[in-house]
Each structure stands twice: as structure tokens, then as C-alpha cells.
Amino acid sequence: MSRIGRQPISVPKGVEVTIDGKDVKVKGPKGELKHTVPPSITVTLEDGQVKVSRADDRPQTRSLHGLTRSLIANLIEGTSKGYTKTLEISGVGYRVQAKGRNLEFSLGYSHPIVVEPPEGITFRVEKPTLLHVEGIDKQKVGQVAADIRSLRKPDPYKAKGIRYQGERIRRKAGKAGK
């Protein structure tokens, strides 16, 4: 059995898990999320814990077992605590500012770049060089943060651009002089 898949997921107070056929709905203080479970995986709710089991031992089913358990755990954590990705902007003249719900980036291009948040995502600008992407869906938060990072990836020579907080940029040596 999958080591991750066999671990039960404890449901914290204030979070309600509903299993309706192959749909798992999680409702918490921050919002509501839903996940459809693959046909070969079964999800049960027993005394405050969600348990994930599989029907057979085929390789595909075995891989889906641990994945499903992790996805449901992410739903529970997202609806109770939420997720945040922090991005740092470094470089001369590189900055971000909030314009209502949208973000306006100055990244050395001839024009400012405006980014609209998708549904369920909020932006928080702490400083002109520090941005927080927040939401309850872990996948969506990570995808939006990756899309923002791709606007100006960190340069390996000067390390300027948008990077995740704590991300180490592998620096390259410049051209060797004479």
C-alpha cells in the first residue's frame, strides 16, 4: 500500500467534509472546494478522519492512491488556513503596485504590465518589491505565482527579475576580460 495514501487525514474543527459518490466537497472558514476522485479510488469519512483506499494493485491505481490523498489534504488545509506564495522583485526600476484588485508591474519593458487575479486569488503588495499571492486552492496559487514569475525570470548574470522568496538563483560568471 502507498505510504502516503494509507495515512488518514484528520479534519480540523470548523471544516466540513462531504462525500457524494465520487465528489469530495470541503467547506471551511475560508471557502469551499471540490475534487472528483478517480473511479478506482474510494474515499470514506470515519470519526473525524478521511480515509483513502484503492480497489486493486495496478500501477496506475497505486500512483493515484497517494495523489488523491495529498489532493484531499490540500483541500482541507486550503479551506482552513489558505495558501500564500511570496515573490520578490529585484532590479533597478523593477517594481509592482496595486491598482484596485489588479497589479501593475514595471519590469524594464517599454510598457507597464497589468495582471488581473483569477477568481479565488488575491494579491497583497507589502513593498514595491514584495508581493504575496493568496488563495485557498494550492494549485491555482502556485500557477498564478509561476505566471507572474515568468513575466521576468531571474537573470543568471545579475540576479534581477521576479523570484520566489527564498529561491536561490544560480549565478554565472560574466565574459572573461583580457
Curated annotation (Swiss-Prot):
Pfam families: Ribosomal_L6
Top-rank taxon: Bacteria
Listed PROSITE patterns: RIBOSOMAL_L6_1
InterPro entries: Ribosomal_uL6-like, Ribosomal_uL6-like_a/b-dom_sf, Ribosomal_uL6_a/b-dom, Ribosomal_uL6_bac-type, Ribosomal_uL6_CS
SUPFAM superfamilies: Ribosomal protein L6
GO biological process, one term: cytoplasmic translation
GO terms of molecular function: rRNA binding; structural constituent of ribosome
Keywords assigned: Ribonucleoprotein, Ribosomal protein, RNA-binding, rRNA-binding
Record GO cellular component, one term: cytosolic large ribosomal subunit
Stated role: This protein binds to the 23S rRNA, and is important in its secondary structure. It is located near the subunit interface in the base of the L7/L12 stalk, and near the tRNA binding site of the peptidyltransferase center.
Family indicated by similarity: Belongs to the universal ribosomal protein uL6 family.
Subunit structure: Part of the 50S ribosomal subunit.
Protein name: Large ribosomal subunit protein uL6
Annotated source species: Thermobifida fusca (strain YX)
UniProt gene name: rplF
